[in-house]
């Protein structure tokens, strides 16, 4: 398994020629990280990191439902992604497709897993691409730096939810 040089607190690995594995610990309970991951108004607070503003965050959280995020980057261009949910286990696991609308032929399947120990959450994202070329293009896009920023923002949003959602919140 190859490791990428990570600049933030998420660890990025390349387990196979078609996969990207991202692991990040959060100082927040998993139901809070999950809530921030699936809630459109919260997604708008973290998904773009420091790179722009999320103008669209749509989530139809059900198997067969869709999601779509659009960000207007600081340099003025628009970046959009969408996908379809394939599996949902509230507070535990989400499997969905992911399509960058700039290259719609490069669909990936993301498996997002939330685990908790001692009040801390480990988020694991396995991105499965159809071929090595798509995986390599994903890496070359600069995704790692933006993802690191987004994960930092996600942690802040999840921590901010502690007083609002102190129970076990589902989907």
Which sequence ranges carry the predicted segments?
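A conserved amphipathic terminal alpha-helix motif
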Residues: 1-6, 129-171
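A short, structured loop/turn motif at beta-sheet edges
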Residues: 30-31, 60-62, 86-93, 113-122
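Hydrophobic ligand-binding cavity/cleft-lining segments
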Residues: 1-52, 171
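Beta-strand/loop substructures that line and gate deep hydrophobic ligand-binding cavities in soluble
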Residues: 19, 95-148
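Hydrophobic pocket/interface hotspot
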Residues: 33-34, 43, 67-69, 85, ...
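Short beta-edge strand/loop motif at the mouth of beta-sheet-based domains
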Residues: 21-22, 41-78, 167-170
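Intrinsic-disorder/low-complexity, polar/charged segments enriched in Ser/Thr/Lys/Arg/Asp/Glu/Gln
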Residues: 17-23, 54, 66, 80, ...
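Hydrophobic/aromatic beta-strand elements that line small-molecule binding cavities or substrate pockets
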Residues: 24, 56-59, 81-87, 98, ...
């Amino acid at each position: 398994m190859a490791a990428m040089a990570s600049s933030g607190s998420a660890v990025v690995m390349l387990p196979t020629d078609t996969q990207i594995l991202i692991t990040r610990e959060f100082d927040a309970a998993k139901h809070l990280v999950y809530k921030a991951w699936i809630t459109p108004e919260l997604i708008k607070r973290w998904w773009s990191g420091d790179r722009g503003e999320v103008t669209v965050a749509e989530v139809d959280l059900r198997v067969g439902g869709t999601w779509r995020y659009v960000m207007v980057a600081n340099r003025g261009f628009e970046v959009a992604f969408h996908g379809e949910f394939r599996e949902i286990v509230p507070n535990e696991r989400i499997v969905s497709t992911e399509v960058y609308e700039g290259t719609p032929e490069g669909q990936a399947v993301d498996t997002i897993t939330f685990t908790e120990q001692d009040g801390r959450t480990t988020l694991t994202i396995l991105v499965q691409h159809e071929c090595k070329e798509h995986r390599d293009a994903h890496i070359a896009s600069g995704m790692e730096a933006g993802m690191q920023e987004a994960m930092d923002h996600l942690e802040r949003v999840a921590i901010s939810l502690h007083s609002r959602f102190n129970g076990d919140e589902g989907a």
